[in-house]
């Protein structure tokens, strides 16, 4: 079926679950077709908006296109697209900013209303009807389970040899039927490599051949290197004092240039055989794997620059043995973050002198991106770092303030704040 034909199956006003997490694994064709359909409906004087739920952020060709077409009524839980952000802050799109570990369960509980359609990118379909996940798992497992109808985008662009990299856990349940999650090491496998779907719910299959968003990371600058050096010095000191084990604890790193620079700093640090237990695997963690400094990494998404993605494709056999992609309800699960003793490192907009952190709102009212998974890891991690250069906008704005204009993480969730000053 064409994307245009599939888009016509999605009526005005419904809740739509789409794949995608930090610019990876999002549908490439349907959002464009939905945007055009919305424009046609609006031109004919008819309303057309849908509510879109994802794993996290997507790309301009999805969030940007839908926002520009006026096709978004509601968006959750995270967004980085500037067009969508402007519409959110103008009050034209209802935005729900949520902890990423809460999204799947809130949808499953029914708190968000029924899901009419799931649009999920996969790499392929096996002979027995199982789905090969793409570059992001996110909330796809939940969307496929709770949606009334399913539209699959089969993307043949990502490496087919990614098959087997994923670990989809089907042991979750609704209270009071929950049981402990049997994951005791960051690189444990507790699920299966495929997604399940009821074939009777699949109403369309659309073929695509297109890569994910090309992320651009700035080279680590002097400030980023100073931040990384302070973190490494702190971790080495904690190890010396016996408060960190010599084999180190699993690392979580947030998204963005500063977080990526901190990972780059670990390349020259004294730590070996590192493990990653994070949301997004970006360039810095790939570098650690390739250099042998990190033995394995667990995430829910692979979001890379163009050059790093080419390396990933060319060395897929190497990376398939070292990377595990899980649903975000597992990658961000507070139970697992606490059990594993994850060392959390996340960026922020500002911190105040009391230790409160603002991760989401510029000047207290302007939504930036969202809280993402920082709260999942900050409150439950063994150590919780928040990092930022001490000033922004060329030195015009201080990132350390008397009192945060908006608080996402209270003083009780924050342990270590790091700038280039120390």
Predicted regions and their residues:
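Conserved alpha/beta enzyme-core scaffold
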Residues: 1-421
